[in-house]
Every structure is written in C-alpha cells, then in structure tokens.
Amino acid sequence: MTQLAIGEATPHGATYDGHGVNFTLFSAHAERVELCVFDSRGNERRYDLPGRRGDVWHGYLAGARPGLRYGYRVHGPWQPAQGHRFNPAKLLLDPYARRVEGELKDHPLLHGGHDEPDYRDNAAVAPKSVVISDHYDWEDDAAPRTPWGKTVIYEAHVKGLTYLHPELPQEIRGTYKALGHPVMVAYFKQLGITALELLPVAQFASEPRLQRMGLTNYWGYNPMAMFALHPAWASSPETALDEFRDAVKALHRAGIEVILDIVLNHSAELDLDGPTFSLRGIDNRSYYWIRDDGDYHNWTGCGNTLNLSHPDVVEYACECLRYWVETCHVDGFRFDLASVMGRTPTFRQDAPLFAAIKACPVLSTVKLIAEPWDIGEGGYQVGNFPPPFAEWNDHFRDAARRFWLPRNLTTGEFACRFAASSDVFKRNGRAPGASVNLLTAHDGFTLRDCVCFNQKHNEANGEENRDGTNSNYSDNHGKEGLGGPLDLMERRRDSIHALLATLLLSQGTPMLLAGDEHGHSQHGNNNAYCQDNALTWLDWQQANRGLTTFTAALIRLRQQIPALTGNSWWEEGDGNVRWLNKNAQPLSADEWQNGPKLMQILLSDRFLIAINATLEVTDIVLPEGEWRAVPPFAGEDNPVITAVWQGPAHGLCVFQRG
C-alpha cells in the first residue's frame, strides 16, 4: 500500500472503487485525523487524512481492498466544559461503517476519560470497521407499497420470532434467513399481515451494566453502528447483508413489506461514564446535545441524545435511512423515541430532520412511523408529527384496555379511539392511517399477560422490579398468574377476543405484537429488553392454534369492510359509520358520556359490531333487517337473526346484513 492520495469528500464512509478505497470522516472541531488500518495479525499502520473540504476529512488508499479493517484516531482539544473530548489514544468506528468486527466489551480501555483523558491505547480491544464491496442481484424485486388503509403491521424480533420454530431447519432458526423461509412466508400470508416490522437490526451493543450482570441487550435499542447489520443473526458477519436482503426479497414476492425499527435518538456511548468508540471521539460537540456544563442532555434515558438539528447530523441520519431503503429495499421505518427527531431543542414540526425527510424523494414515499415521545420536557408529542409520519397511538392502547378490562371509560371516549382518534390525528392533511393502533408492543405486557397479571414481575431483569411501567391497565380476572379454573380461563379468552376484535376492526392502522395471536406470555415481565431466553422466544409448539385462527379471521374480515380500508375520515351521513345503542337507536348525549358499555357500530351499512362490555348478559336489539354472524364469530349453526342478540358479558359479535 502507498501513502494516501487526497481522494474525494464524497460519498461518506469507506468506498471501494475496484482499485482502492476512498475514506471520509466528518469532524468540525478536529485538528487532525488519522486513518488506522490493521493487517491479519492486528498490526496497525496509520495515515493522516490529507484532504479537507469544509468539515469532511478525506483520503484515498490505493490498493486497499474489501475486508480491510480500519478505524480512526481523531486529534483535537480536550475541553469537557465546552463539549470537546478528543483523544487520539482511542480507536474509533467509522459512523458509516457497513460492517464491524468485534463487540463492544465492558473494558476499561474503551473509556475515553471523564474530567481528564484516558491515554491508554484501546486498539487491542476496540471494535473495527470493515471495508465491504457491495454487489447484489435484486432480480425483479418490487416494493409492495401496500396502501395505509389495507396495512396490518406485525411487530417481531428477528431471533425471538423463529428461534423455537420446529418446522424450520435447525441451522437457520433465529436468523435473517428464517424470515424469508417458505414456512414463515406461508405463516404470514395465512395470518393476513401485510408488513413485518422488525425490532432493531442495525448492529447494537449490550450495556456495560448488563454485561456485568451476565445479561445481554436483547431488543437492540443501544445502537453501535447504524449502517451495519447485527451479525449475530447471520451465518457469518460477511454474509449478513445478503442474507437479510434475501429475506426482504422473499417477503416482497409474497406482497409483504418490511419495516425497520431504527434508533436515531442516542448511541451506545451512553453517558460520560460510557465507552468512547465513535461519535464522542469524532466530534462530541456536533453529534450530541451538550448542556452548558459540558454534560449531555439526556432526553432519551440512555445517557446521551443525538443532535438531529445539526446540519451534518441531519445528513448522517438521512444517509442512514436512504441506505436501508436503497441498499436493502426496506419499505419504511418505525422511529424509536421519535420526538428527539424534532428537537431544536424544543419540538418543532418544521425541524431540520423532518424537513429533510419530506424533501427527499426516497424517504418521503416510504412508511414512516413515529414513537411520538421522549422523556424530556415537552417530549410527549402524540398527534403533532408532520405528514407523512404516522404515529403509535397510546390513546388507543389505553382506551381499549380500560374499556374491556374494567376501568372507567366513557362510550364516547371508546368511540373516538375506535374512529382513529380524529381529535388527535385529523390535522395537517393527515388520514386515519396516521393512527397506528396497538394493544401491546415489545415493551409492556403481552396480550395474554394483560389478562393474567395485575402487577409487573420483572425480577429477572436484576433491578428489583423497579423497571418497567406501572400503568398497565391490565386485569388478572381474579387470580395473579397463568392458569386457573375453567370459568376464569374462559373469561380471559373472551377478553382477549374482544381486545383483538377492537384492534383489528377499528379505523386506523393496526399493529399486532408477534405472539399475541399465539397466547404468548412473558410471565408478567413488562420490560423484557434483557431476556434473550425462553421468556421472549415464541414457543410455536405451545401456540394456541384456535387463537391464531381467530386472529386471521379478524384480519380477513377487516379487509372486507370499506369503511376500514378506505383510509378517509368518517363524516356524519357518509354511510361509513353509525353509532347505535342497545336498542338500535342513535346514542343519546347521556349515553355517550354516562351510559353503560353497550353499543352497536354499523360500518359501511352492512357490517354490524355489537358490543356488551358490561359484566351482565344483555339483550341487544339489532337494526331492522336480516343479520348473520360472520367468522370468526359464526359457529357451525349460524342462523339469521332478525331481532335480538343475547350479548354475553364482555362479549362482542360481528354481523353482516343479508
């Protein structure tokens, strides 16, 4: 290899052109940048990056090839009070690295220093960036582009979804390959979901605290390398990218979209006591929100917060998103703690990152879903994200649980949430699909645990049950824990059925947590982020097949109802919806606010949802005409009903006219 040529300032990262590699690194406050390359024995050779255009340092290494391991040492001031923490003793990952070798260990050499710099060299233990050459045959792949009105999202963990699946080859269980295997594709099609939303697949690390406890970060919300696939779920690190793309291609052929959960709000460098392995050492002041005392604004609860209003960090975030769309053909993103994306530092709908995404022809046309909060002041922003974002609707989640798992909730509040929370989302030209309705998600109780536990049971997490929310709106139906007498089990079943029907027959975009259609339980753990074990892995052999069939039938029913698939707001008299009482009369003002939980919802003038959320069997008079129960509510004997449905306690039934 020769000394570096000046090279080019773009594209960002390490780019192989067939003759060598061009390297670039953004740092506005650095005084010198060294490229460090490593041979197969770990010997290091350093080169100064000779070029600088604006704040991008660059150089070209002729003869360098894919597989080259590299990192950076960045020189500059150590001025913690001003937010500068340069320390050339620390080898740093390329923020644009497409592959990373090594894990982020809990090791003292990875600490950059607190008040004073730690000058011990960390190259022997630091993870290293790896140059790749990217060639992939997408064949005739095409994005499904499912309309929002027909979208049904299935949230799943790559490993947990398939690790225990007995029909998959042993060697691919819990991997990217399994996602596109015919067994899984057939299951997704049978269930009826249209989009697979994956918990983070970008390479992540386990926090030092978890490593000391013998636990791991299972969910993946501790990002280490935003452009690199997490290698643990691949046959080898070298094949991870192609195996993931193979899965995307197989899912697309079946008409199933792939949405990635992505973490742009913080990094695995954590607080000032965390490891220094990338952004902190490259340009701490630019990449993170820094307080006046030089410490971090911790609006994420993870120790640091990315400054997504800084122009170069906005560019970094957008390039990351474009990479996943253009290189991996993903169909959208769910943004973790997405209020951080709009901080300037206060939340603004016209924040720089939002404006950049909206202006991008690649990003503005994929599905964008916000988790519309963070833990900072003014962080709760449900309903306030600009188009084209959809948002997780926690109003729906809480209202559905409070309605069916006895709590105080008016019929009016329930109806509002059933109608895509128009009071929250009907603004700025947004459609009902902007409300992503959910009962459960990866964080919180599973659906089965919602009907089996009144209290969280997170002792296995090692925090003496202090972690996880206490606001679960759950009901154990008289006994804490799984199991119980037959009548209790039947009441729990009825509650699950009612909740699933509410989710899948409401206006908006439904999201189903993987395993809820099986009856999966985490035994009351509502924060299983560090449980990479049978607590979180779906047990397919113990799956409740009847519940799976029930769920699939609900999804099929949903796709038959124009009022739900049209993705337009319901207006009085438009034929989409009528709200009726138990006597088939329009609900009175008093019934909206003070009446019992008895109602009928007539959709598209031919589908009737009869609801009895009281604790008593109640007769419900159906509207004039002939009605027949439809699957999954129809039994073998399915007579026409012309007058009264005897609604069981906590019961719900759907009828079709004629």
UniProtKB/Swiss-Prot annotation:
Pathway: Glycan degradation; glycogen degradation. Its EC number is 3.2.1.196. The active site is at D336, E371. One of its GO terms (molecular function) is hydrolase activity, hydrolyzing O-glycosyl compounds. It catalyses: Hydrolysis of (1->6)-alpha-D-glucosidic linkages to branches with degrees of polymerization of three or four glucose residues in limit dextrin. Residues 459-484 are annotated as: Disordered. One of its GO terms (biological process) is glycogen catabolic process. It is an enzyme of class 3 (hydrolase). The keyword Hydrolase applies. It holds the Pfam family GlgX_C. Keywords: Carbohydrate metabolism, Glycogen metabolism, Glycosidase, Hydrolase. The record marks D443 as: Transition state stabilizer. Belongs to the glycosyl hydrolase 13 family. Removes maltotriose and maltotetraose chains that are attached by 1,6-alpha-linkage to the limit dextrin main chain, generating a debranched limit dextrin. This is Glycogen debranching enzyme.
